[in-house]
Amino acid sequence: MKVAVLGAAGGIGQALALLLKTQLPAGSKLSLYDIAPVTPGVAVDLSHIPTAVEVKGFAGEDPTPALEGADVVLISAGVARKPGMDRSDLFNINAGIVRNLVEKCAAACPKALIGIITNPVNTTVAIAAEVLKAAGVYDKNRLFGVTTLDVIRSETFIAEAKGLNVDDVKINVIGGHSGVTILPLLSQVQGVSFSDEEVAALTTRIQNAGTEVVEAKAGGGSATLSMGQAACRFGLSLVRGLQGEENVIECAYVDGGSEHADFFAQPILLGKNGVESVLAYGEVSEFEANARDAMLDTLKADIKLGVEFVK
């Protein structure tokens, strides 16, 4: 199994690469690419960790050598948020980066599963889809927006608020991956109930958690370590699905035939072809139904921005 990380010298990329080096199945290959000249050195550094995962690093303008033969590609390249920015402010820089990298994926590894981490995910996934369509290799079951950070934050914050073991908390987070488009389905969490006030406060905290980190780092970065963990969890789930493991389920932002929008985050069953099936996200509360309906104009506008960027 070969996993490529594009943007591997960045804050998310290095954290993700470290976690993959220690957690990928024995015999896997880990390929690191970044435009930054330090990238081969990151690979050398990681290669000293005693796990049966082979690491190679590639720098420069062309990621093709890193992509050849990749089964999974995780794209975290781009600029990070700074105080005062929201994820959509990143669009002007990151849109072009994602377009260029996905063009290379289309040529070098057209069958790979591609996970987009680069923000704004609501838009960059739509860009990736249009690039793959233009190249004639688009398969909606092989493209994912990685929204796992919203899930792990929800798990953490719920466990903290209710004094639970975080391993026991399971939650679906639907919609998109910025602001009001992030919707944790708190009404579905087993064995716990929330007051209306708790639901409103927790939902807002989960939606604004990225900003919480950006402000806490005081201009020194955004959520890199927790995002690295989230991306590793999702990447490992992709690998487990490819290897034939059953019942591998994650939430992700996909072109899944949703009634709500062309791309929508919801639970998916992963397998040898990427998305084996898109799962129903179940019954929602009145609060959740209203929040879902209220987000759709924002989500659709984000998607349209990505489609028009490529066209």
From Swiss-Prot:
Belongs to the LDH/MDH superfamily. MDH type 1 family. The active site is at H177. Homodimer. It catalyses: (S)-malate + NAD(+) = oxaloacetate + NADH + H(+). The keyword Transcription regulation does not apply. CDD domains: MDH_glyoxysomal_mitochondrial. It is an enzyme of class 1 (oxidoreductase). GO terms for cellular component: cytoplasm. The gene is mdh. GO terms for biological process: malate metabolic process; tricarboxylic acid cycle. Keywords: NAD, Oxidoreductase, Tricarboxylic acid cycle. NAD(+) binds at G7, A8, A9, G10, G11, I12, G13, D34, N94, I117, T118, N119, M227. This is Malate dehydrogenase. Pfam families: Ldh_1_C, Ldh_1_N. PROSITE patterns: MDH. It comes from the Bacteria. Substrate binds at R81, R87, N119, R153. Catalyzes the reversible oxidation of malate to oxaloacetate. Its EC number is 1.1.1.37. The keyword Oxidoreductase applies. The lineage of its organism: Bacteria, Pseudomonadati, Pseudomonadota, Gammaproteobacteria, Alteromonadales.
